[in-house]
Regions:
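Structural motif
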Residues: 11, 34, 149-151, 179, ...
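Short, glycine-/Ser/Thr-/acidic-enriched flexible segments
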Residues: 1-3, 18-20, 41-42, 47, ...
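Short, well-ordered loop/turn elements at secondary-structure boundaries
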Residues: 7-9, 109, 117, 146-148, ...
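Flexible glycine/proline-rich, aromatic-decorated loop/lid segments
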Residues: 3-38
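Residues in well-ordered beta-strands of folded domains
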Residues: 36, 115, 122-124, 151-155, ...
């Protein structure tokens, strides 16, 4: 199941799938915090290894193996659990262990502390203001796209995980490619019918995708599922199916947090 990144690689170190490996201990926070552990269920089908073992063996080859003092995944997990009061055997019944039977609520009078200069919720952040950022900005109206241009909106569905499952035989049969949702009236203006191949382009990339004409989308926007448009030819089922939204996304980001702004790209749509 080649990814596009693996397709470009000179050397591939294949990791076992989630059913074929034991993972590190993970923690879930909340009112009833707990730790959970995914254990190997079946033997690997091919010459693959656990991710932590791949890292250890690379480290040994470059002389830093002393930073990875374990010989297998069980040893690593037991080391993680040292001092917690839990053992690997405690996970066998349910796959997780809770820190206690009761929910842990915050002490609302004395225990609710905020890491702000005032110790309170700051709608106008003094930390951001002191760093030169306007922390309580005024509303700026957004210019509506026109002339065959639309705001690109992307999202996911419950059938696929990121870009890693589109070549899975069963999931590919259910959802093999993404479509471009476009408003019925806007599609009519552009001469686009449901199922027509359309050309979509942005200032940084382009592609061809099938149109899904619907009333269930805003006239100023178009929508596509994330995770398609694979370029790896050995991923034969997902290769060249649909369009990757990453090809179209312009480099716009949140200047304070640094996160990408996924819905700030304007695209042009026309009959292919």
């Amino acid at each position: 199941n080649y990814s596009d990144i693996a397709w470009y690689a000179d050397v591939i170190l294949p990791e076992s799938t989630y059913l074929e490996r034991t993972d590190c201990v993970q923690q879930a926070n909340g009112l009833k915090p707990q730790m959970f552990l995914r254990r190997q269920a079946v033997e690997p089908r091919y010459d693959t290894r656990d991710g932590a073992m791949i890292l250890k063996q690379i480290a040994e080859r470059i002389g830093t193996g002393n930073f990875f003092p374990y010989e297998n995944m069980d040893e690593l997990v037991r080391w993680q659990l040292e001092g917690t009061g839990f053992s690997m055997e405690d996970f066998e019944a349910k796959g997780f262990v809770a820190y206690g039977k009761k929910q842990i609520f915050m002490d609302r009078r004395d225990g609710l502390k905020f890491k702000t200069p005032s110790g309170k919720i700051e709608f106008k952040s003094s930390l951001l203001e002191d760093a030169g950022f306007e922390s309580f900005p005024v509303y700026e109206p957004v210019t509506a796209p026109s002339g065959g241009k639309f705001r690109l909106v992307v999202g996911r569905n419950a059938l696929h995980t990121h870009v890693s499952t589109q070549n899975n035989p069963y999931l590919n049969e259910i959802c093999s490619e993404n479509e471009l949702w476009i408003n019925t009236e806007k599609a009519a203006d552009l001469g686009i019918n449901n199922g027509d191949p359309v050309a979509i382009s942005s200032p940084v990339g382009s592609g061809e995708i099938k149109a899904k004409v619907t009333d269930l989308i805003h006239p100023e926007a178009v929508f596509m599922l994330h995770g398609f448009g694979h370029e790896a030819k050995k991923a034969s089922r997902s290769y060249n199916k649909g369009v990757s939204d990453s090809v179209l996304q312009t480099n716009v980001y949140d200047k304070i947090g640094g996160s990408p702004a996924y819905h700030e790209t304007v695209v042009t749509v026309k009959i292919a």
